[in-house]
Amino acid sequence: MSSALQTPMMRQYLEIKAQHPESILFFRMGDFYEMFLDDALVASRILDITLTSRNKNSADEIPFCGVPFHSAQPYIARLVEAGYRVAVCEQIEDPKQTKGLVKRDVVKVVTPALVTESESLTPDENSFLLALCSSGQRWGCAWLDLSTGEFLTANSDNLAGAATLLASIAPRELLLPDQLRRDLPPELALVAGDRPRAAVADWVLDKDYCSKLICSQFGVASPEMLGLAVTELSEALLATGMVLHYLQENRHATLPHLRDLTIVRQNDHLALDPATRRNLELTATMTDNKKSGSLLGCLDRTATAMGARTLKQWLSYPLVQVAPIRRRLEAVEELKENPALQDQLREQLKGVHDLERLNGRVSMAGAGGRDLRSLHDSLEQVPQIRLALTEATAPLLRDLTEELDPLQDIRSLINQAIAPAPPFSLREGGIIADGYHAELDELRAISREGKGYIARMEAQERDRTGISSLKIRYNKVFGYYIEVTKSNLSSVPDNYIRRQTIATGERYITEELKSYEEKVLGAEDRICELEYTLFQEVRERTAAQGGRVSRTASALASLDVLASLALVAQERDYCKPVVDDGDTLEIIEGRHPVVEAMNLGERFVPNDTRLDQEQHQLLMITGPNMAGKSTYMRQVALITLMAQVGSFVPASRATIGIADQIFTRVGAGDNLARGQSTFMVEMMETAHILRSATTKSLVVLDEIGRGTSTFDGLSIAWAVAEYLHDTNHCKARTLFATHYHELADLAATREGITNLTVAVKEWNDQVIFLRTIIPGAASHSYGIQVARLAGMPRNVIERAKEVLKTLEEGEFEQGSPRLSKSSIAPPRKETAQFTLFEQQGDLLRERLKKLNISVMTPLEALNLLDELKKMA
């Protein structure tokens, strides 16, 4: 090891770095965080800061770089965003009171999900850490947003359920046991994508150890007191313990705002697998993963960041119990029908900051004076909101109003203790309000008076000495001093004590000046210490009431969501759906919420839908591409989901029989990374639907079988439709769109299947898609007309018409379609078979011309082929 690394400071650095080899170490050195060696090389490149070195131009050069400690957060955020962990190492002793090397230690490790500073968080999104573990078939999940204190856990009976949870939570960081991290199942890896993955040692998955962590954090005697049954929810218990262990390793501090653990039972919510969430674009679009253009973007008119996050959670976890859905609908209805109340509520909510995250920072001792002031200003809105809701009649509105705690004691404390416009840094001074503490007020008076005395002394000394340029100044090295220029040195009095020679003159002190310096500086030092102590006391007293703040924040967030849904319903003429436990799903004049809201320059054509377990169990939808089949099917799924969220829906009337699951299969891309083609993905997703769907499910299938040959695809689509209709455990309410027109024949043999098609008008060799869903089956696909609309070259369109005409008329030469304009038939061989064909050629040709292939069933085609073979 080089001698440069043998200094006491560098030895200390290397010891601490060895404990955090996977992190970039921010090593506190006075007013800077410094990075050394490889960390410096990485950080300087990513942060675009100067890389320098200790022992420059020697064989023992040590690369290093640094950032100011008071502005380190943006730099930490950039490193975390780039995929690095950052270990923050602080001086844990006061350098002024320490001889020799200052003690240092890591106080926290910042990872993607352990960021709590507001600048590094997306306001309208949770920042979840999700832990996953398994024991055989069962999986445990626990997820925590450290910035808000939301902590949830769940068990899943299978891998598909774990993938569904992962998709719905969309964590910023995954936490896995070592073995699972090395061998993550493909189903989870696909959903996890490129999210950062942290690991805990496999030994952490010990029930006794995890139970101890849980009991310690939540102050209970056993996990069962939180509802975590050791047998029934053992995997959830282990996942929860993983999260707490990870926090213990990386935060090095108590987390009092983690007060509650919510157990999520999957049968309490509408199940939406990853493919369905993606296909319905619930919270982000498929094309660019943006909120705009998604259902969330369409419905989000919330006034607070808390409300925006809560709306996203509601959309991710729709309800399946009628009573709570109706409570939400009644609340939305009252706010919709009372615009004055809605406006007043929204106006007050605009004055509410992110209470959940403010409360988190206060509890973790990370809040500054401005945070406490923001907390105060937010709580100031609560009495007005309670007053506005006094006359509310909807049970949910009344219950939420009761949850609103004005926290008058905390508001008064902050208002009295914290200055109206506190500085950013706690050490700048001026954070405590005048009049709050008698000793502090006295010290401030001394400081102000002392500074005034210094100013008066400067004027007096100028008069006494006749030196008009004499100045009294201050720096940290010499304290207060008198500065005299060279030209006036002959006028310096005898009582001046010289302290320093500078280029422009001399610096002096006097006994009187030093006496006042001690008084003033002593007061200022004491002011800083006292202010910091008082602020900590105020912050701790506020943190002690964090539970009350948390409940109020949750109620405000729910009110914000209800007001947002009411506003959207009012502006877009949505109706209140009737939600029940029946099997009927009936939508009158339904519209697609997102497509309608985007207002693409044309009126959205509404359509009716009826699904039940009798004559309308499976709707077989045929029709041309671009006619609106996919939009129609998605809108039915979205309207169902919106109703179960508790939202009004885009229709003139709707009755929604609760769905336990929604499945969609509406297209896939090649998954080359897993060696799976479009068709393989399509078949896997369809198989999952057939295994999982129940009579209470809603299934949306679009163009099953299109990824393989025509006969294979038709056969698979036919069998899937029969299975969904005939299999008792899987008789799901189904929308089945297909380009195989032969499937329309199923309606003749199965009473639960109804044929629907999209109305089309042909005019002057043009096709007009009317977007209206009508009873019946399509006879044409209008593919060439769609190609024309897509801008295909004219000569390609004309040639396609010729080929289509040839195929439809069944014109054959030598037993093959005559597709080549200039083809010349090869010489015919004289065989008995040829002679036989020639003798019956006219009869066969006439028979083939009359065929209408587009309406033949597979069985009819096979029978005809057998007949023609016998004729030949």
From Swiss-Prot:
Keywords (alphabetical) are: ATP-binding, DNA damage, DNA repair, DNA-binding, Nucleotide-binding
Superkingdom is Bacteria
* Alphabetized GO MF terms: ATP binding; ATP-dependent DNA damage sensor activity; damaged DNA binding; mismatched DNA binding
Under InterPro entries, the record lists: DNA_mismatch_repair_MutS, DNA_mismatch_repair_MutS-lik_N, DNA_mismatch_repair_MutS/MSH, DNA_mismatch_repair_MutS_C, DNA_mismatch_repair_MutS_clamp, DNA_mismatch_repair_MutS_core, DNA_mismatch_repair_MutS_N, DNA_mismatch_repair_MutS_sf
Residues given in the record as ATP binding sites? G623, P624, N625, M626, A627, G628, K629, S630
Single biological process term from Gene Ontology: mismatch repair
* CDD domains xref list: ABC_MutS1 (cd03284)
Which GO CC terms are listed, alphabetically? cytosol
Listed PANTHER family: DNA MISMATCH REPAIR PROTEIN MSH1, MITOCHONDRIAL (PTHR11361:SF34), DNA MISMATCH REPAIR PROTEIN MUTS FAMILY MEMBER (PTHR11361)
Among NCBIfam families, the record links this protein to: mutS1, PRK05399.1
Q: In which family does this protein belong, per the annotation?
A: Belongs to the DNA mismatch repair MutS family.
Protein task: This protein is involved in the repair of mismatches in DNA. It is possible that it carries out the mismatch recognition step. This protein has a weak ATPase activity.
Q: Which protein is depicted?
A: DNA mismatch repair protein MutS
Species per Swiss-Prot/TrEMBL record: Trichlorobacter lovleyi (strain ATCC BAA-1151 / DSM 17278 / SZ) (Geobacter lovleyi)
Taxonomy of the source species: Bacteria, Pseudomonadati, Thermodesulfobacteriota, Desulfuromonadia, Geobacterales
